[in-house]
Amino acid sequence: MPRHTVLEFLLHTTTKIGAVFMENTTTSPDVLERFLRYVQINTQSEDANCDQVPSSAVQFDLANVLAEELRELGAEDAHVTEHAYVCAHIPASAGAEDKPALGLIAHLDTTEVAPGAGVKPHIVHYEGGNLVCGTVDGKPVAMSTAKLPALNDLAGEDLVCSDGTTLLGADDKAGVAEIMSLVARIAQDPSLPHPALGICFCPDEEIGHGAELLDIDTFGCKYAYTVDGGPIGELEWECFNAAEATVRFEGQSIHPGDAKGRMVNAGNLFCDFNALLPYVQRPEYTEGYEGFYHLEGVSATVDHATARYIVRDHDAAKFQQKLDLIDAAASMLNQRLGEERVTVEIKQQYRNMAEIVRDYPELIDVAKEAYLACGVEPQVLPIRGGTDGAQLSFRGLPCPNLSTGGYCYHGVNEFVPVSSLVKMTDVLQELVARFA
């Protein structure tokens, strides 16, 4: 089916979701209807194409849908840039015209670390125990309460899941749907208090693009929030300092029978190098403010090996110590070999936005008030990752991160409670009212 036909189908038809028939009527919440449509549009970014923006042409598919919907909701300037940014502005409500404009930002793309095309969302009424989202090869795809204790608090909830063969895409299409549903509420009732709003949906967040092509001056907002967090109530204004380390190992191939004193096995050099990094500072052993070294991939032969690590820490000094240790490990191996066979290339990715956002405590206070007004207890947590808001904050647009309501991102067990989609839209409505 041609791409434009697919988009027309998604825009103008109802969607059968499992045993539940969802229409764009009052029988289902607006935010749910939008979310179910958006997740069916594949938007996976591609790290192999990170030198271009967007990294995948499919991100334009959702971008074009959103721009059209924004125009239908009265955002006359809604448009898609050549780099797949969706940008639009909503005029302030009466009496709030002199208030600073506020930005709301989410990202279009989904990660490529799990299957993301052909998402088939359905609603599971969760009664407790294992959450089974689908079956693959006759076996249930399930999440247990032992692995996710938060499930114990969700018994009786309706949860949107995938069919178990793909991720769901709540990261970050839940955020997209919640922002769009807020815009729809304002279009229906322009008297809802709000300042002028800047709306932006960005490409390639999952591969670290960081919204670097957003024209902040044209966007015209004094502050912004990304809607890209996890379970409802999360409020984040601290993130990792982040870098990528590419380590290359050069070996010397010799016939194994004649190898003594002559062969240098690049694969073994990698193993020696990796063993010099602290075992307990791997992601699977860390939490909270604890940083890590994460081996994302390695390829090796006797002659050549390349390993790619991401390095993370909230504390700038500890972050630098981690980078220094990588250099020291390479130097130690080279010294042992008596020649340079291990080289390190460090690429800085983003910094902890707390350096900027801590000077704007009102952004945190207002967000807390909005959560509490909706009966949600705010949970201020450090982000164990990054958001577009990290780079935007350093570019002059302070930008904390709000929750979407989703769980288990980047995997086939990803889900989001229907009630969280609705409640988070309520939180956004309360939030913008406090800036009016």
Predicted stretch roles:
Residues 4-21:
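Short, Lys/Arg-enriched N-terminal segments with co-localized hydrophobic residues
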Residues 28-56, 161, 350, 410-411:
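N-terminal capping segment at the start of a domain
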Residues 50-99, 103-105, 109, 120:
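A non-catalytic alpha/beta surface segment that caps or lines the substrate-entry region
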Residues 96-196, 201, 221:
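Active-site metal-coordination/substrate-binding segment of hydrolases
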Residues 148-151, 157-170, 204-327, 331, ...:
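Midchain, well-structured core segments that form catalytic/ion-binding scaffolds
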Residues 301-303, 377-430, 435:
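Zn-dependent metallopeptidase/amidohydrolase metal-coordination segment
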